[in-house]
Every structure is written in C-alpha cells, then in structure tokens.
C-alpha cells in the first residue's frame, strides 16, 4: 500500500500541473510537425521495432566521472526575482554524458522543503520531441511561476532534465551529434546522466525513484525506464531504485494515436462530417500504404480546427501584436496563455543564466539545432508490457481537452493491451468536485483530468 499511496502523491503533483496550466503552442507544434512527417512522404524518423532495447543493446557501461564538489557548485543562491522566504534548496548545472564528444545535459533540481530526506526522487521530461523540461519547471509543476504567484507543490524532490543535447541549455561540442539524435541516443544519454547525477547527489541513491513526463515523453519515459531495468540486472552497475512511471497525454502508439486524434476532433465539433467520413473511408495504416485521398483528408482534419491551442481546445490564446503581448489571464484557473513568452524572456536574461550556472546562449522552448530525429518506434506498448511484468507501477493520465494526444488515443492504446479491469471506472474528487475519472487495470492505472490539457 505504501507504493500505491506514493504513486497517488506523485500523480497528484502532475495533475495539479495540468489543472494550473494547459500547454504550450511551440511544444504542440513540435509534436504536430513530428507526427505529420510520419504521415507524409517527406523524410521521417526510422520507425523501427522497439526490440532494439534488449539485454545487449540496452546495456551501457558505467560511465561515471568524479563528482566531488559538484553538488555544492550547482547550488543556486537566488534566482533573479525569486520571492523572499524560500525554504528549500535548488540546484542547476551540467552533467557530462560523453567527455570525448563534449556532450553535456543541463538540469534544474528542486528539493522538497517538507520531508526532503524521505520524499521520493522524480525525473520530469517534457516531450516535443526536442522541447525543454524547463517549461515543466517554470510553467507546470515546478516551485516558481514567472510573473505569476502560482501554487507550489512540495510532494517530491524533482529533477527537470533538458534532453537530448541541443535542447535548451544542453549542448554538444561535436556538431555531428545533432545529426544522429533519436530515441536510442536519448535513452542512453538520460541513463548516463542519472548514474552520474546520483554520484553528485549520493544521498538520493537509495531513494524511491519515479520517471514522469508528457507528450512525446511517452517514448522518453518508457524507454529510459526499461534501460534502467536492464542495467539494474548487471553486476557492478549503479542500482537505480526505480519504482514506477507516470505519463501524461503520452504518445505511445502510432496507430491508436492517430485514430484517437481524428475521432476526438470530430466528436468535439472540430472536424466536419465529410472529413471524418473521408478519414474512416481511406485511412487504414496512416502511412504511405494508404491511398492519396487519405493524406488529403488528414490535411483537412488538421486544418479545420483553425487557430486554437491544440493542447487545450477551450483555452484563450495569447494575443500578440508588434508592440506588446496581451494576456487573457484567467484568475480562476490560474492560467495565463502568455506565460511561455514570459519564460522565454526570463531564461534569456544574462543574470538568470548566470544564476542557473548555464552557458551563455540563446534559450528556446524547443530546439532548432537538432537537424533530424533518426529513429522512433511506431509503438512502445511492448516496452510497457515488459515493464508491467517487472512489477513497476505504471500510470497513464490524460487531460480531457487536449486534441494533440487526446484521451481517446490513450484509451485505444490501453484497449490494445487487452488488460483485465481490476477496479471499474469511477470519479475522483478535488475540493469537493469531480476532478476526473480513474480506472485500474491489471498492472496499469488510467486517470483522466477534467478541463485540462497536457
């Protein structure tokens, strides 16, 4: 029961992030462009089998560098604009994952002010692919809001990792690295980051550890978890005390993902009957095996919703003109559609980068330095099955107003797993109101969040 209660606590942390904010247009565009590349005849990632991640290829040597003094050097004194009375420690800096290539990943770590010595350790990953997890730190579930007095959640000690190299402040001194980035290299580097980070923060080596994330992190989270699972079997390897994974509105299976998108768009009055009928008539595989008409209707399906936030179909947009940014701030839901522009401005200030121990650079929400994404499996459901047999707690949660990776996609993917139901669909509540719904399967839990996007 302890493990289940802990997972509920971690899920609550992620859900509050969803209830407070709804998503980022640039991250939506990154995933949208990535998925459209799969449907077009343009160069797209190699849709390989998940089986590359196995006992042989998923094992990595103990690449551990000396970390003495690094934790103290990474401690943040105060961030510009930080409120008075902050009663927790936070850190940021780089962990080298390949000294020969000069490749290093940037992280921000916030300790819990309450019970930090016993609360679990959580790794948070934003998706994209190629989008920064500092979006999560400063807009979703981190301790601060930029230009906003947002709530703070202190249920865990959280690492926000900018991954892969080329995203945010993370970098490589070998430019060819940016031409060979994909799921494989991202999982490898994230694992090497973790074993070195635990050397830097040895007090967390035995702590219960959870991996969480959203969107394309449906790939990142599961592949990293399985990499840890494989390497934990090796002798003389750093043992990571992985207890579970939590994925929000995650892209985990191409076929059910696309069907879920198009069914959601039609049932939420964002697509015409004609377009929906065309999708169902000509769409079978959602790749180049389908007739040309399928591609035509797919384009119509993506264009018909118009200029809305795909990650929250009911949210206001940030109104920009040449002289200012106009915000339609919603004090009830604590949601400001312009918050990402504040973050973009804040993280590009020289004094902020200095306080974060970041290399002086131009920070962006999503990377344009990574030239291509070279590999991506069409489904990671087999990896989820393997993780289930290992005894890990697996939670999939979904905001019900996200049209990019909608609840329908998640439900269709779970149906594909053919899992027996342990506890039937039921509401869960927050502040005496229904916050969403939960259904427990054998080895997996599904949670929905009302009026929330990614």
Predicted regions and their residues:
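Terminal and linker regions of secretory-pathway proteins
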Residues: 2-454
């Amino acid at each position: 029961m302890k493990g289940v209660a802990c997972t509920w606590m971690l899920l609550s942390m992620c859900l509050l992030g969803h209830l407070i904010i709804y998503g980022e247009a640039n991250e939506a565009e990154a995933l949208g462009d990535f998925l459209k590349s799969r449907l077009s005849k343009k160069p797209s990632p190699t849709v390989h089998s998940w089986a590359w991640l196995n006992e042989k290829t998923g094992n990595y040597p103990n690449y551990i560098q000396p970390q003495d003094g690094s934790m103290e050097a990474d401690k943040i004194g105060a961030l510009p604009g930080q409120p008075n009375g902050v009663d927790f420690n936070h850190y940021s800096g780089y962990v080298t994952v390949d000294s020969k290539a000069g490749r290093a990943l940037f992280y921000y770590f916030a300790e819990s002010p309450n019970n930090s010595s016993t609360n679990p350790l959580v790794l948070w990953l934003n998706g994209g692919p190629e989008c920064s997890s500092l979006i999560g730190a400063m807009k979703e579930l981190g301790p601060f809001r930029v230009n906003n007095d947002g709530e703070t959640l202190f249920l865990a000690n959280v690492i926000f990792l900018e991954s892969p190299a080329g995203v945010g402040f993370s970098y490589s001194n070998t430019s060819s690295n940016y031409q060979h980035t994909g799921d494989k290299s991202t999982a490898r580097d994230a694992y090497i980051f973790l074993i070195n980070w635990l050397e830097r923060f040895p007090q967390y080596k035995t702590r219960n550890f959870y991996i969480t994330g959203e969107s394309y992190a449906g790939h990142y989270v599961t592949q990293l978890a399985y990499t840890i699972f494989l390497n934990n079997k090796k002798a003389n390897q750093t043992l990571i005390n992985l207890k579970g994974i939590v994925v929000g509105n995650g892209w985990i299976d191409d076929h059910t993902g696309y069907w879920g998108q198009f069914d959601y768009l039609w049932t939420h009055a964002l697509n015409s009957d004609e377009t929906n009928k065309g999708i169902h008539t000509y769409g079978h595989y959602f790749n180049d095996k389908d007739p040309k008409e399928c591609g035509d209707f797919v384009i119509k399906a993506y264009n018909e919703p118009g200029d809305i936030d795909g990650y929250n179909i009911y949210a206001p947009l940030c109104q920009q003109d040449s002289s200012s940014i106009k915000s339609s701030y919603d004090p009830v839901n604590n949601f400001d559609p312009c918050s990402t522009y504040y973050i973009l401005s804040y993280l590009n200030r020289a004094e902020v980068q200095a306080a974060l121990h970041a290399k002086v650079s131009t920070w962006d929400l999503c990377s344009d330095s990574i030239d291509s994404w070279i590999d991506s499996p069409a489904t990671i459901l087999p990896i989820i099955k393997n993780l289930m047999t290992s005894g890990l707690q697996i939670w999939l949660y979904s905001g019900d107003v996200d049209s990019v990776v909608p609840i329908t996609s998640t439900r269709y993917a779970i149906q594909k797993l053919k899992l027996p139901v342990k506890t039937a669909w039921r509401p869960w509540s927050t502040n005496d109101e229904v916050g969403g719904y939960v259904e427990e399967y054998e080895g997996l839990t599904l949670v929905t969040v009302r009026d929330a996007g990614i």
